[in-house]
């Protein structure tokens, strides 16, 4: 079951991309990692967009403690897997648009189960992209400045 934010809103997180432990890269799903300064974002996997270098990229986005590797002891992190993208964007500031929640966080028995689910999440994100106008959340881009790592609701365009 998928959940959308109440129309006409999406959540936008602005943050600097930090180097992580490279685990996503080693299992075939590299991510742009943004620290989350506070609670308020719903943990789970989302379909959305990442603004980077003046371009928009579809992304499967995870927010949570990364329970497969760290249990509840891991610090919260936003990890965005940009589809069809392989550039190094460490230390760049990006905007991450959380548009549709795909599922909650869960712990997997191991890496094979996790990678199978990540592949399904990417497929679900691609399916979502086919139903969304690429410019929909950006047609009336908000003129807001937010602290790094803080999410703000933004009105979606019609």
Where are these regions (language model features)?
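Phosphate/ribose-recognition catalytic cores of enzymes acting on nucleotide-derived substrates
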Residues: 2-158
